[in-house]
Amino acid sequence: MKKPILILLNLLLFINFSSFSQKKKKQEHHPLDEISINALKWRSVGPALTSGRISDIAVNTQNPFEYYVAVASGGVWKTSNWGLNYTPIFDSEDSYSIGCVTIDPNNPNLIWVGTGENNNQRSVPYGDGVYKSEDGGKSWKNMGLKKSEHIGNIIVHPKNSDIIYVSAYGPLWKKGGDRGLYKSVDGGKNWDRILYVDEHTGVNEIHMDPKNPNILYAATHQRRRHVYTYVGGGPGSGLYKSTDAGKSWKKINKGLPPVELGRIGLDISPVDNNVIYAIVEAAERKGGFYKSTNMGESWEKQSDKYTSGNYYQEIFADPIDLETVYVMETWMSVTHDGGKTFKNVGEDFKHVDNHAMWINPTNNKHWLVGCDGGIYETFDAAKNWDFKKNLPITQFYKVAVDNAKPFYNIYGGTQDNFSIGGPSRVNNSHGISNQDWFITHGGDGFESQVDPENPNICLLYTSDAADE
């Protein structure tokens, strides 16, 4: 009996030693070094049939066939043939979320981009400051303000390209960061913060008087997002004016609601620089649409019209008609009497949820509008719309694949669009087109899963009004 016992002891010792060796190996295991995927070659499979969320549009006034599109989570795109083709020009940079794009009025090849979407939704990505291109978007350089996370807009002095103003919204989920209004007098090499309220308040918009570049108007917004709630306003929100190019500021809230304010959208009428419009979010539902006829010295309420500072609250004054102003919201609206009354512009056969607008300065019936469904163009003030079907910037929440043969299919749910599916490859030389993609359910879509044994069975998760 001694021999079997000895064998058993040896076996136990071997097992224990093996176990110890395995534990030691696990303990000595070092995390893998950073893996680069630069060697992988990516190809676009689309889709563009629903496009995606636009944050800004900048048109070259010297060549209206050329314009730039800032995408909430899809970089910057450029067209040189009025939308027949779009080219991604920001894919190699460190941020994919864009808040604004600005063309230098003195040099159309000098482009400024503010990263980090300029809205306050839960799904809003952050950026890493401002970028500058001196060759029409072929190459870029990060010019700083990396801790801003969200940029509202950028203005370049109309006679001096070295002078730039940046409205830094600041981090959405925390205090501090690069927050406030910044100015550079050396082309972005250095920045001075010329307007600052507090660590919770950023500047969401900066506007320059069209006749006097020393006169500036700034809107500040106190906001903070938490996992459990969103704080959309506070004592830091308000309007400010400078008459000395930002050296000094005064608050211009006279006539605005005497309560805590939220997000304020501004625009100066190109027809008369004495007239400024403001759409104001305020506590106790006291917000509304305001008008100043004395360059912001006082404000008069025109109506109760306001939108959501969480997602909209931007306005655009008509370049020809003094009394016409457009409001970006779920259904885009317009006033023709200076803000007293509003009506929807008409969006039949157009995606809603609007964020950006360009109005032709010589033909105010010709617009470009950016929404959650891409770029739309109208030549007759919204009676008819042309959808740009070649901008593949759809925001997918999640994607899944099936086991179909010969090529697997891709499924996913999208932000403010449908749940959709499409092929990974096709049997023709033209490649995948919008016609190859198909809608599986309404939106917002979120998650899709496909039966691994039967690719015809697809499970979908949707939110909001997808079943209506």
Task: For each feature predicted by the language model, list its residue ranges.
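Beta-propeller blade termini and top-face loops
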Residues: 22-463
